[in-house]
């Protein structure tokens, strides 16, 4: 598995230093927007930041914190880390697709190419002419997950990749969550365009 450590993300030292400093000082904004063109590493940066927070790591090596927590990040399976991303109907998921329906494919996608594009993701899903989108079912799933206590007693982090693919119903439901977040909840929205 490929680890997503700050030290493995090329350049962007100012951003890495800012993120680690805010985490170490305990000033972690509950909602953040990472914007960058395809291939700029916004997803890798978001995962490295989530790992830094959840595992209580120090420095750009993302080490020195909770080792079992760091191990869970190798397979992107930390129980307090949630992902939302565009999905489509497929042979297996015929109606109301949501991110959790494709979590194994997502982890494989992340492991294989943390700088992967939306096109690469659609290839894995086997999308022909369909447009992927983030639907209200994802927002409802996140509401349920965030209502639970964190597994490790710390933060709960949701990374929303390709935020511009949210439909209106999903964005309305998520907006309410962003406006009134529960304690120790962090949302990282990733977009290619502001």
Regions found by a protein language model. Give the residues of each.
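Short, Lys/Arg-enriched N-terminal segments with co-localized hydrophobic residues
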Residues: 1-3
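Clamp-loader machinery-focused feature within the broader ASCE/P-loop NTPase space
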Residues: 5-164
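ATP/adenylate-binding site constellation spanning eukaryotic-like Ser/Thr protein kinases
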Residues: 78, 171, 194
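Conserved catalytic/switch belt of AAA+ P-loop NTPases
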Residues: 147, 172-186
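Sensor-1/coupling segment of RecA-like P-loop NTPase cores
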Residues: 160, 166, 180-194
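Conserved ATPase-coupling elements of RecA-like P-loop NTPase cores
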Residues: 166-172
